[in-house]
UniProtKB/Swiss-Prot annotation:
It comes from Mus musculus (Mouse). Gene3D superfamilies: 1.20.5.170. The lineage of its organism: Eukaryota, Metazoa, Chordata, Craniata, Vertebrata. One of its GO terms (biological process) is keratinocyte differentiation. This is Transcription factor MafB. The leucine-zipper domain is involved in the interaction with LRPICD. Residues 34-43 have a biased composition (Basic and acidic residues). GO terms for molecular function: DNA binding; DNA-binding transcription activator activity, RNA polymerase II-specific; identical protein binding; protein-containing complex binding; RNA polymerase II cis-regulatory region sequence-specific DNA binding; sequence-specific DNA binding.
Amino acid sequence: MAAELSMGQELPTSPLAMEYVNDFDLLKFDVKKEPLGRAERPGRPCTRLQPAGSVSSTPLSTPCSSVPSSPSFSPTEPKTHLEDLYWMASNYQQMNPEALNLTPEDAVEALIGSHPVPQPLQSFDGFRSAHHHHHHHHPHPHHGYPGAGVTHDDLGQHAHPHHHHHHQASPPPSSAASPAQQLPTSHPGPGPHATAAATAAGGNGSVEDRFSDDQLVSMSVRELNRHLRGFTKDEVIRLKQKRRTLKNRGYAQSCRYKRVQQKHHLENEKTQLIQQVEQLKQEVSRLARERDAYKVKCEKLANSGFREAGSTSDSPSSPEFFL
């Protein structure tokens, strides 16, 4: 259809022909490259030539009697509106005149690019949804198109492939709409990372209560890091700070306990030493008394021995006296 619209300067004004033209979708057909020297098909009432590199978007769709004869091909022929038409079709895949609220004449003028579109184009999703709605409520009016000089065989040859492609291509809007309908139900459902984050957030109030103080103090850093997987950074920092505080507190308590134990030990040793000093003092006093007693006794013995020696020398009974 794009080739006939681009090469023909005049279009049929019949309402049935316009409705038949408008019902075609540009991208429902296979896109293929046609060679420069394409031979004409024998046995067809109408023949056409296309420029080299042109894109065939649709089979012959308009009646042969209502389309003027195609001009002869020349290499110096300026580019037609076919590229613009293909560009418009590729960007707005399903351009429907009813979706734009256009008349058939405006739709044809917009397709061939001779006049600007009266209304601003809507978004792609608007075209898609409107086209999907249109095909649900207006199913294939061109299949029963009876006339305008086209035989039933020619119409069947073009309508049936279009019918086949139309049924194959119509599910994508519904399939594309189904993920969009499933998005509100799929997004609230948490993914794996969101589940881990939700689990960590759910245990936010009991993160510090998950491990006892003894477990935090006795647990190694590697084991603690393995248990803290899945928690947020703030929770890990808070729990490690608590562990550090408990460790410092335990270290302080241990040092205080050691100091107290050492103090008790020193006090016990001091008491024992004091007792030993008292015992030694008592021993010294006892020895001093014994010394004094021995001294007095020694003095007494010395005095008594001197007297005995003096009395024996003065006695006349001694042998020296007689000599």
